[in-house]
Each structure stands twice: as structure tokens, then as C-alpha cells.
């Protein structure tokens, strides 16, 4: 079957009535509902029209904003942890932490337990004293199990000798630096003994020098005169010993 070029490019007037009715279907025109009129076709899929696509710049900006929010929240949490305060602990101006408690066995007098390098150490010292006096009724900074185990590990501490447990713990904490003090006192005593021995030896040597010096004896008109040559070295020794 052959088609002529004229038949392929025929005018629209030569279309059949069925083709015209298909193109000009009334259902594809305006919606007849009471809503504002808009172009509507029942066979068209409008699902894609409800999705909005953002540009890459907008997506990056939102991610940066979300990251800044999360970072600020983390910084706030870290600041809260660093500024945490413990019961019975006070920070000293030079950076140390002091622990103190009111001794209920001594009419509530305030007792200074000691100074510590870390706030946690001072808080544990307070918990030990509070638990030793009040038991499970005490308000602690750390769990009861932790405080009980720390008391068991402490040596040479008798909390039940009839006195105040708070004072016993205070004496224990004050003994932490005692070995250093003993070492210093022993070193100072040894240095003083060394200095005294040096001074005694210098004095004996000076006397021996003076005794070994020859004396000049001169007799004039029945009078005996003795002259001793002290020397410059003996004079310097006397000046040093007098200072």
C-alpha cells in the first residue's frame, strides 16, 4: 500500500469526527465543581507535583545549621559537667579543694577534713565522714557501695574506738604528707650536725696551729716577756668562728 506525500501532510480539516471528539474531550477541560476552576484531567498523575526539590546550597546550609545546634548542645553539657558542685567541698583560691563537714557527735561543730588536688577526692572524703557518722541515712555525693569500699581500703583507721569518726578520718588525711615532713626534718638535723662538726674541727685545728707556733723569749732587766706569732690564718679562723 502506497502513501502519497499529499496524504501524509493533509490539512486538519480532513480529520475524521472521531479523532476530533477524542482531542476535544470535555473531561480534560475545566473541573465543574464549586472550587476555583483549574485545568484538570482524570487520566493525569499529579503525585509528582506534591514533591518539592531543594537546591544543593539549601541542603548544605540546613546541615551546617543542624551541626551548629548539636555542637552547642554538647558544649553546654561539657560546661555543666565541669561546673558540677559537690556537697561539703569548697574550691580554694589557689586551685585546691577543701572538704569539711559538721560533726554530729560533737554538737554539729564544723570540722575541716583536708585539702585535696581534685574535687572528686574531696567529695569522697566528705562521703566517708558522713557515712561513718550517719550510715545509710547520710546524703552522699557517690553511691553507697563506692563509699563503703573506700572505707574498707583505708588502713590504720579505727572508726569505733569511742571517739569521733570524723576526727579519726581527719587524722588519717593529715598523715598523707607526714613522710615528707620527716624526711625534711632528718635532712635538716643532719645538715646541722655536719655544720657543728665542721666548726669543732676548725676550732681544734686553729688551737693546734697556735700551740705549734714558736715563742720568742726575751729577758730584759729581770722581766720575762713572751711574744706569740698568731699569723694571718689564725686571725681569719677567729673571725669565721665569731661570725
UniProtKB/Swiss-Prot annotation:
<feature type="region of interest" description="Disordered">
    <location>
        <begin position="157"/>
        <end position="220"/>
    </location>
</feature>
<keyword id="KW-0010">Activator</keyword>
<dbReference type="GO" id="GO:0000976">
    <property type="term" value="F:transcription cis-regulatory region binding"/>
</dbReference>
<dbReference type="InterPro" id="IPR044808">
    <property type="entry name" value="ERF_plant"/>
</dbReference>
<dbReference type="GO" id="GO:0003700">
    <property type="term" value="F:DNA-binding transcription factor activity"/>
</dbReference>
<keyword id="KW-0539">Nucleus</keyword>
<keyword id="KW-0936">Ethylene signaling pathway</keyword>
<dbReference type="InterPro" id="IPR036955">
    <property type="entry name" value="AP2/ERF_dom_sf"/>
</dbReference>
<keyword id="KW-0804">Transcription</keyword>
<dbReference type="Pfam" id="PF00847">
    <property type="entry name" value="AP2"/>
</dbReference>
<dbReference type="GO" id="GO:0006952">
    <property type="term" value="P:defense response"/>
</dbReference>
<dbReference type="InterPro" id="IPR001471">
    <property type="entry name" value="AP2/ERF_dom"/>
</dbReference>
<keyword id="KW-0805">Transcription regulation</keyword>
<comment type="function">
    <text>May act as a transcriptional activator. Binds to the GCC-box pathogenesis-related promoter element. Involved in the regulation of gene expression by stress factors and by components of stress signal transduction pathways.</text>
</comment>
<dbReference type="GO" id="GO:0009873">
    <property type="term" value="P:ethylene-activated signaling pathway"/>
</dbReference>
<keyword id="KW-0238">DNA-binding</keyword>
<feature type="short sequence motif" description="Nuclear localization signal">
    <location>
        <begin position="170"/>
        <end position="186"/>
    </location>
</feature>
<dbReference type="InterPro" id="IPR016177">
    <property type="entry name" value="DNA-bd_dom_sf"/>
</dbReference>
<feature type="compositionally biased region" description="Basic residues">
    <location>
        <begin position="169"/>
        <end position="185"/>
    </location>
</feature>
<feature type="compositionally biased region" description="Low complexity">
    <location>
        <begin position="186"/>
        <end position="212"/>
    </location>
</feature>
<dbReference type="GO" id="GO:0005634">
    <property type="term" value="C:nucleus"/>
</dbReference>
<feature type="DNA-binding region" description="AP2/ERF">
    <location>
        <begin position="85"/>
        <end position="143"/>
    </location>
</feature>
<keyword id="KW-0611">Plant defense</keyword>
<comment type="similarity">
    <text>Belongs to the AP2/ERF transcription factor family. ERF subfamily.</text>
</comment>
<protein>
    <recommendedName>
        <fullName>Ethylene-responsive transcription factor 15</fullName>
    </recommendedName>
</protein>
